[in-house]
Amino acid sequence: MRLLVYGAGVTGSLFSARLHEAGHDVSLLARGERLAALRRDGVQLAQGDSPAARRVPVPVVEHPADGYDVIAVFVRAHQVDAVLEPLAGLEGDVVFLLNWAGGPEPLGAVIGPGRVLLGFPTAAGTMDGDVVRYRAANALTRRRWPTIRTRSAA
């Protein structure tokens, strides 16, 4: 299964690095200076205040493209509208992992109602230059809203 992580901030970088280290086929979408840093150094992770940072060579892309089975979106709520249009033309389910109270309907109206999943990552961290400093956590909440297809099967 091919995964695209859309958003190279703290949580997107952390999740993509962890998925890559676990052997999954994952790419990380980034732009601008963050893209250049990731191409040069990979995702750099440091737990807490540790002076040691490890480099994880997650493949990075600048633009979303077809060929991914799942796209995990790690952006802030005010950035969602900007990513919907590029996602609408792609295949694969889209998991929105952010603080989103609007429900799946406005997202599904643009990208297709059967493709939307919502979740909330329980990871904490901060950017220290190009290094992601994180606190260890192992939980992810998720919910798939029933679609016409899943309601009729129930």
List the predicted regions and their residue ranges.
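Rossmann-like NAD(P)(H) cofactor-binding subdomain of soluble oxidoreductases
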Residues: A52-R133
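Generic structural signal for hydrophobic residues
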Residues: F15, G103, R151-A154
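Active-site-adjacent beta-strand anchor residues
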Residues: V5, L28-R31, V73-F74, L97, ...
